Amino acid sequence: MKGKIIKGIAGFYYVKVEENLIECKARGKFRHKDVKPMVGDNVIIQVENGKGVIESIEKRSSELLRPAVANISLAFVVFAIKSPDINFDLLNKFLVLCEYNHIEAIVCLNKVDLVSEEERENVKKRINDIGYEVLYINAKEGLGTDILKEKINGNITVLCGPSGAGKSTLINKLTDKEHMLTGIVSEKIGRGKHTTRHSELIEVSNGYIVDTPGFSTLEIKELMEKEELKYCFPEFEEHNESCKYRGCLHNKEPKCAIKQDVEDGKINKYRYEFYVKTLEEIIEGEKNKW
């Protein structure tokens, strides 16, 4: 039987086959091959003695490692515009992760009622200028959920972002159900209390959304080689191969087209600085491997 993994908890996988949800374990062969089923996987299962067994996993179109979700076609990157303030480094990490996995990213700015229209527009422009769509939402009030449902149609959509951004509240509004516990932001540290316990696909508008555990730890230096990073910045695309030296990393090399674009104001200086900082982390990580 063919189905899709909807949820995974403690080694058990819940596979949707038509209208049925079957609890499954994975065959031992996956462990020996160092392959682990992921939420979102399309799988073939057999039912033995009333228990489901995952026999095979179909090829994945995409995957996120942290959180572990497969076959995602769209990501809502959810950040509160205030309380807590946006951590742009963390936002950039999420965007790089999406680009690396060839997943379309839409930035959803929550709690927009806490700032002025001018502040909203300034943040939106900053994100638009690097090539990403921005949607304003208010998870508590349900503002923006209609357009989000339109985007979800036909996709597996991941909601990612820092804890306290309102992801679980947003899912409750999108599904009209309390699928996840919701928490409050700790006044002491400005972070949300960890409220989501596992990754789970939830059916919405002829598609799926998946919420993921808070405090996602993103270590870009563990994901990619230094040569790959520049392709995760859409604004570099036009001139990535225009530098004097082939394989230019856009850092210390002379006559670099990207550095020239930064000087000319065509590429955001902060984004470029984030790129260089991340590149140096990857290079340092590669040194430590040996």
UniProtKB/Swiss-Prot annotation:
It holds the Pfam family RsgA_N. GTP binds at N110, K111, V112, D113, G161, P162, S163, G164, A165, G166, K167, S168, T169. CDD domains: S1_YloQ_GTPase, YjeQ_EngC. The keyword Zinc applies. Binds 1 zinc ion per subunit. Signal peptide: none annotated. GO terms for molecular function: GTP binding; GTPase activity; metal ion binding; rRNA binding. InterPro entries: G_CP_dom, NA-bd_OB-fold, P-loop_NTPase, Ribosome_biogen_GTPase_RsgA, RsgA_GTPase_dom, RsgA_N. GO terms for cellular component: cytoplasm. Its main location: cytoplasm. It is found in: Cytoplasm. Keywords: Cytoplasm, GTP-binding, Hydrolase, Metal-binding, Nucleotide-binding, Ribosome biogenesis, RNA-binding, rRNA-binding, Zinc. Zn(2+) binds at C243, C248, H250, C256. Its EC number is 3.6.1.-. It is an enzyme of class 3 (hydrolase). PROSITE patterns: ENGC_GTPASE, G_CP. Residues 61-218 form the CP-type G domain. The keyword rRNA processing does not apply. GO terms for biological process: ribosomal small subunit biogenesis. Its cofactor is Zn(2+). NCBIfam families: ribosome small subunit-dependent GTPase A. Monomer. Associates with 30S ribosomal subunit, binds 16S rRNA. PANTHER family: SMALL RIBOSOMAL SUBUNIT BIOGENESIS GTPASE RSGA, SMALL RIBOSOMAL SUBUNIT BIOGENESIS GTPASE RSGA 1, MITOCHONDRIAL-RELATED. Belongs to the TRAFAC class YlqF/YawG GTPase family. RsgA subfamily. One of several proteins that assist in the late maturation steps of the functional core of the 30S ribosomal subunit. Helps release RbfA from mature subunits. May play a role in the assembly of ribosomal proteins into the subunit. Circularly permuted GTPase that catalyzes slow GTP hydrolysis, GTPase activity is stimulated by the 30S ribosomal subunit. This is Small ribosomal subunit biogenesis GTPase RsgA. It comes from Clostridium botulinum (strain Alaska E43 / Type E3). The lineage of its organism: Bacteria, Bacillati, Bacillota, Clostridia, Eubacteriales.
